[in-house]
Amino acid sequence: MHCPFCRHPDSRVIDSRETDEGQAIRRRRSCPECGRRFTTVETAVLAVVKRSGVSEPFSREKVISGVRRACQGRQVDDDALNLLAQQVEDSVRAAGSPEIPSHEVGLAILGPLRELDEVAYLRFASVYRSFSSAEDFEREIEALRAHRQVPTSS
């Protein structure tokens, strides 16, 4: 790796540690030319393939932005949005594929969002699933009610 200070084409790794709950590796490096130290962070690239076929890196910020629009006017704080984005990223990474269709990202958002805020879930689902009638909303509300009534095992 090039030194960011003197642009020497090599550096030596001094220390490596996992960060971000094992999703990244933080490396402390030293330049043999100028002697300065710097830190790098390595993560595995996860690409999202859009409907058009274009591929772009997965972005937690885009997940948060989309969910924030659905949560507008609701009592949902930034910590909850960040946690949801982390859950979505963990879910899509667990698929084990370096590329994932954007449709799968949307599906990964729905579950955690339903648990976070049902109104925001309905808003997001209505756009994501292209609701076109009141009946679409009614069906989704019935599904929400049924989900609420399923007993959870302790």
Swiss-Prot record:
Its cofactor is Zn(2+). Residues 46-136 form the ATP-cone domain. Keywords: ATP-binding, DNA-binding, Metal-binding, Nucleotide-binding, Repressor, Transcription, Transcription regulation, Zinc, Zinc-finger. A zinc finger (unnamed) spans 3-34. One of its GO terms (biological process) is negative regulation of DNA-templated transcription. It comes from the Bacteria. Binds 1 zinc ion. One of its GO terms (molecular function) is ATP binding. The keyword Ion transport does not apply. It holds the Pfam family Zn_ribbon_NrdR. Belongs to the NrdR family. PANTHER family: TRANSCRIPTIONAL REPRESSOR NRDR. NCBIfam families: transcriptional regulator NrdR. Negatively regulates transcription of bacterial ribonucleotide reductase nrd genes and operons by binding to NrdR-boxes. This is Transcriptional repressor NrdR. It comes from Mycobacterium ulcerans (strain Agy99). The gene is nrdR.
